[in-house]
Structure formats: C-alpha cells, structure tokens
Amino acid sequence: MSAASVSKVVVVFSGGQDSTTCLIQALTQFDEVHGITFDYGQRHREEIEVAKSLAKRLKITSHKVIDVSLLNELAISALTRDAIPVSHELMENGLPNTFVPGRNILFLTLAGIYAYQLGAGAIITGVCETDFSGYPDCRHDFVRAMESALVQGMDKKLEIITPLMWLNKAQTWALADKYQQLDLVRHHTLTCYNGIVGDGCGACPACHLRKRGLEDYLQNKAEVMASLDKATATGKPQA
C-alpha cells in the first residue's frame, strides 16, 4: 500500500516542531487528518494545550487526547519526573536521561488501534534518525518493526509514514517554510523540555537542536531547500 492510495490518516501529534510540521504536510496530502495526543504526565505537559490550540487553528478533521498516565508510573525519566534534572550528558547505557522507555511503542500501538476504528490507512509520526536525540524508538528499523507488528496483530493494511526520518533539523524547518508555515511552527509550537512555547528556554537539549537547525536553515536557505527536495525525492538517507 502506498501513501497515494490512502485518504484518511492519524497523526501522532504532540504540538512540537516535528509533529506539527508533519500535520501541516498531511493536510495538503490527505482528505481526512485526525490528530492523537498523549497525556502521560510529561514534564512539558503544556504541549497538550498547545496541541489542542494548533489542532483548532489548522482545522484538522478531529483531535483526540488520550490519558496514558500509566506510562508515567512505569517509565522513570527526566521527562516523567520533575525531580530529575534534564541532562546534556548520556547515561551509563548510552541514552539521554530524557528517554522514556516504551513511549513510542505505546503511542504507535494506540494510534494503530485508533486508525483501525477510523478506517484510516496510515499513521504519521515525526520521528527522525538523521538529526535526533538518540532515542532508539525513533529509528527506521524500529518503525518498520512496529508497522509489521500492527499489520499482523490487527490483520489490516496499515502504513506508518515518517516524513522526517531522513531529514535533519534544518531541512525540517525548510519543510515548514515550503508550506508557508515557518512562523507558525517557530512561534506557536512547543519543543522545549521545560514547557516554554516558541524558542523555548534555550538551554535544554531539545532547544539546542531546534535552534541549531533554525540557524542553519536561515543562513543557508537555498542550499537547505535544495537538499530537502533531494531528500524527499529519494526517501533515503543522504550521504
């Protein structure tokens, strides 16, 4: 099944830069775009209200917020415990302390169930392997494994689309600009781990990654846009 044959999709939507960019793109490609947001008691839970506001502003087909607070009880992380400071250093296992084990496994499973009930042919998620935070559940191999599990477990054709998988952060900004939504993504999304909308706190790892990508794009617009066109045309990692 190809994305071209799909008319109805579910977007895993946090209200951050990546998922909002995916949502904006989806609105140009599909007849029905349904957003699903997860409340797991996250440190930056302001993102839920941001997602609600953006869903209304962008006039998506529907928006559902799901309570998954059980994840907060099971997964100890800087994103689920205010008492654990967000660190720029990796833990002993080589992962950031903001990694929430099982988060995307749970999110994609629930999004798959929702897609099944809606009759949607695809889930869209903004995970990325090229310029990312080091989370293992953002990798291409993980997504393909989850897609296979959902298809087999529900006996339904279902695709997981990852528009940003092989894009770096500068190219992700370029993608928002391509749809004339750079200002909306810059000023009205929430990526910051400390819950500050727009440019954020400027200190956490998420803000650093976002800022570096924006600066790169603004300083090299033509070059980055050309590289975006090449990356989206091939759908493969760029050398």
From Swiss-Prot:
GO terms for molecular function: ATP binding; ligase activity, forming carbon-nitrogen bonds; zinc ion binding. Its cofactor is Zn(2+). ATP binds at residues 13-23. It catalyses: 7-carboxy-7-deazaguanine + NH4(+) + ATP = 7-cyano-7-deazaguanine + ADP + phosphate + H2O + H(+). One of its GO terms (biological process) is queuosine biosynthetic process. Pathway: Purine metabolism; 7-cyano-7-deazaguanine biosynthesis. Its EC number is 6.3.4.20. Zn(2+) binds at residues 192, 201, 204, 207. It holds the Pfam family QueC. Binds 1 zinc ion per subunit. InterPro entries: QueC, Rossmann-like_a/b/a_fold. NCBIfam families: 7-cyano-7-deazaguanine synthase QueC, PRK11106.1. Catalyzes the ATP-dependent conversion of 7-carboxy-7-deazaguanine (CDG) to 7-cyano-7-deazaguanine (preQ(0)). Belongs to the QueC family. This is 7-cyano-7-deazaguanine synthase. It comes from Shewanella sp. (strain ANA-3). The gene is queC.
